[in-house]
Regions:
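Walker A (P-loop) ATP-phosphate-binding motif of ABC ATPase nucleotide-binding domains
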Residues: 9
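The conserved Walker
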Residues: 15-16
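Conserved phosphate-donor/acceptor-positioning beta-strand/loop module used by diverse small-molecule
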Residues: 102-121
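Conserved substrate/cofactor phosphate-moiety recognition/catalytic segment
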Residues: 24-83
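Hydrophobic anchor at the beta1->P-loop junction of P-loop NTPases
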Residues: 12
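Walker A/P-loop
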Residues: 21
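Small-molecule kinase domains that catalyze NTP-dependent phosphoryl transfer to phosphate-bearing small molecules
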Residues: 127-193
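Phosphate-binding P-loop
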Residues: 2-6
Length: 193
């Protein structure tokens, strides 16, 4: 992929509802952030480098959505990779081609315990029941209604597939972040006057 030539990439991966977007916000903020500084040190990332973020799915639509291309101007690009989304084989193939053309590629895998993930999926579905993600995450969540044991096994197998994929990529750095390491501030509730 020619847009990635000479770029430093950080792939932030995890299942739906694991906290990837929150993690990316923390890693791309310009405010003081001890967690970000720790991750940057561990991965050898220059904190002064201009950065942006984009989802792996958006990279497949650069021709139809030219606005996405401007995110690729920066030298450091964080890529949001949902390991439970649809069209995994296409996205994995794209990731491999990107890895061959970029200057460096590092991976941050967000490890979320099954019970925490299950609670977040339930909350997501309760908030907006008509917008269930039609992906592997939804299948696992539905399976958990009948057999929590098999759902947990299926959930863990997604991480194993991801680990197998990234073993075949020549990485410049890899980090596993446990969900409890990320500081989460509760969102302020909107008040209606």
């Amino acid at each position: 992929m020619k847009e990635m030539i000479g770029k430093d990439l950080v792939i932030v991966a995890g299942p739906s509802a694991s906290g990837k977007s929150h993690l990316i916000r923390q890693l791309t903020t310009k405010r003081k952030n001890k967690f970000r500084d720790k991750v940057y040190r561990q991965l050898g990332i220059n904190p002064q480098e201009p950065r942006s973020h984009i989802s792996i799915g958006a990279l497949t639509k650069l021709d139809s959505k030219p606005g996405h291309s401007r995110k690729l101007i920066k030298e450091l690009i964080f890529i949001h990779f949902d390991i439970t989304s649809r069209h995994q084989s296409d996205k994995q193939h794209l990731l491999k081609s990107i890895a061959n053309s970029c200057r460096s590629i590092k991976v941050v895998t967000l490890k979320t315990p099954f019970d925490v993930w299950h609670l977040r999926m339930r909350q997501r579905i309760d908030v907006n029941p008509t917008k269930n993600p039609s992906n592997i995450a939804d299948e696992i969540y539905r399976l958990s209604r009948f057999s929590r044991y098999f759902a947990r096994w299926r959930y863990e197998s997604i991480y194993k597939k991801w680990e197998k994929l990234i073993k075949n990529i020549d990485l410049d750095g890899q980090l596993i972040v446990k969900n409890e390491e990320i500081s989460v501030k509760p969102r302020k509730k909107k008040t209606i006057d």
